[in-house]
Amino acid sequence: MGKKRVMVPAKDVDLSSIKYEPEIVQAPHLTGFWFRFFVRLIEAPLIGPFLLTMLKKENKIDQLLRNTVFPEEPMFKPEYPPQEKEHSVVELDEDGRPEGRVESALNCLPHYDPAKLWENSSATFRYWKIRDYAYAYQSRKVTPSMVAESIISMIEENGIDKPPTPLLLSFDAAEVRKQAAASTQRFESGNPLSILDGIFIAIKDDIDCHPHPSTGGSTWMHEVRDVKKDAVCVSRLRSCGVIFIGKTNMHEFGMGTTGNNSNYGTARNPHAPDRYTGGSSSGPAAIVASGLCSAALGTDGGGSVRIPSSLCGVVGLKINYGRTSMEGSLCDSGTVEVIGPIASTVEDAMLVYAAMLGASPANRISMKPSTPCLPTLSSDDDTDALRSLRIGIYTPWFNNVHSTEVSDKCEDALNLLSKAHGCEVVEVVIPEIVEMRTAHLVSIGSECLSSLNPDIEDGKGVKLSYDTRTSLALFQSFTAADYVAAQCIRRRIMHYFMEIFKKVDVIVTPTTGMTAPRIPPSALKSGETDMPTTGYLMRFVVPANLLGLPAISVPVGYDKEGLPIGLQVIGRPWAEATILRVAAAVEKLCGESKRRPVTYYDVLGAN
């Protein structure tokens, strides 16, 4: 590996000397027979380690981890200095009733008259908001049971819960009818639990939602792990009257960014059925984009909420690490993954977020989270807060995309925001981006392996899909020393970002470096390995996961093929209110260009 590299302490790095190095991922793109053959090779006792060593050498992974000296101590979980309070916000009681937090969130929203929009059809496409459903229920135009019947018929008639292109992996019409009947009764009695009462939400298949099994997109996880109750975040939503339509498709165990699932079939992008949805929360993003439900819950360990949200043209919120409990999810002990909402609008994501938030007792002790807040979008203070906003952009990184259509559209949105609200755009420098990517890969890979290893050792590994086996082979090559080195890098990157956040309030990037990739027909049966595409999809999402920061993807337009493009807003620690405020402003400026997906179900209009 050559002479070792000794890093200067992060606090002494001269940012003026930093030169951006484009991230180039070196790995073959394989499908079909050659992919299956490749997997068998890397799993072989002798040749496998050799091939993995060569791949890691090509991508400088071993050089960064094993031939570099980092003076920083490891940071095994995100640690933050004390943060300033956000401005023009409402504080929420995370120990209070979820219904109360949802009511507070509702009071933060700007004025909206569903009756006017309900009665006057518009040529401009828009998604039905949660407030539209609430108005329809309260005015007795429809009932939750009527909407449930529409959803059930759409699911059954279009094979949405069946191969070869399922959005749902677990669906029970009787269970949906039961929940809808209870909600209908509450409305008839004049006692809805909250504005979320009667709202239909889907749950990613690595989050427990009783009585459905949790498979993680695999063929066997439900055989070794019983679901006896809801995950904590699901339970909070249920207490608000939410109706759960089932468990959604996903990239097996979250180990992929396209959404490919050779076990059950691959979900398709509602804007282009020959394109991937993005992953790993493929089903949640696609089911929201297709109009079947108002929101969904996904998990995000490496962009898995934001990537598919961007590719499917919806909103995806990655909350701060530790902001809500992970209890009841398949990955409840890692340091990079969180549960977050996907919704058709920023305000709907905000309402769902308000219901589900609440740190676990352990994280309250170790992380000392700031009080959760929401932006007061309904007041004049919102305008003042936007006017004083400082937006950070690292231009060479921002522009390192597969097609300039992506960066151009995101830059247009940024210019609109600056022109409309007088926001200041500040050029920043982010050092060691390649090191950051490597540290994230080792962290999430080691944590996934630790979670799955007991079942793999028990013989379940051979039942995994080929692309999952590829990922696990790489993860198994990491050592304890690699993991510690990755955590030293985490501390360095945290220092850089905390220094940047002394100058700016948010950092803005494209959400992904490309629009939705085409699905190779040869990848449907056995999956594929395409690390260069993964590199483009994950280019901008890694900091929020490695550092635990809040981030949101909001749609800003389309490329020349009609594929959605998302803008990502990354916030300071615990600053969900700020990124929600920025996303709401961007959505308002770019919302008129929203297009109806090719695959769209008008659930509320059908009644």
UniProtKB/Swiss-Prot annotation:
Q: Which GO terms describe its biological process?
A: lipid catabolic process; N-acylethanolamine metabolic process
First-tier enzyme category under EC: hydrolase
Could you tell me the superkingdom of the organism this chain comes from?
Eukaryota
Enumerate the catalysed reactions. N-(9Z,12Z-octadecadienoyl)-ethanolamine + H2O = ethanolamine + (9Z,12Z)-octadecadienoate
Task: Kindly give the Pfam families that the UniProt entry links to this protein.
Answer: Amidase
Q: What is its EC number?
A: 3.5.1.-
Active site annotation, chain numbering: 204 (charge relay system), 280 (charge relay system), 304 (acyl-ester intermediate)
- Main subcellular localisation: endoplasmic reticulum
Which InterPro entries does the record cross-reference, listed alphabetically?
Answer: Amidase, Amidase_CS, Amidase_dom, AS_sf
Print the keywords alphabetically. Answer: Cell membrane, Endoplasmic reticulum, Hydrolase, Lipid degradation, Lipid metabolism, Membrane
| Molecular function terms from GO | N-(long-chain-acyl)ethanolamine deacylase activity
> Could you say which residues bind substrate here?
301-304
Q: Does the keyword Hydrolase apply?
A: yes
Can you supply one Gene Ontology CC term for this chain's record?
A: membrane
Subcellular location(s) of the protein:
Endoplasmic reticulum membrane; Cell membrane
Q: What does the record give as the function of this protein?
A: Catalyzes the hydrolysis of bioactive endogenous fatty acid amides to their corresponding acids. The hydrolysis of endogenous amidated lipids terminates their participation as lipid mediators in various signaling systems. Converts a wide range of N-acylethanolamines (NAEs) to their corresponding free fatty acids and ethanolamine.
Subunit relationships: Forms homodimers.
Q: Which family does it belong to?
A: Belongs to the amidase family.
Supply the PANTHER family for this chain.
FATTY ACID AMIDE HYDROLASE, TRANSAMIDASE
> Know the name of this protein?
Fatty acid amide hydrolase
Q: Which gene encodes it?
A: FAAH
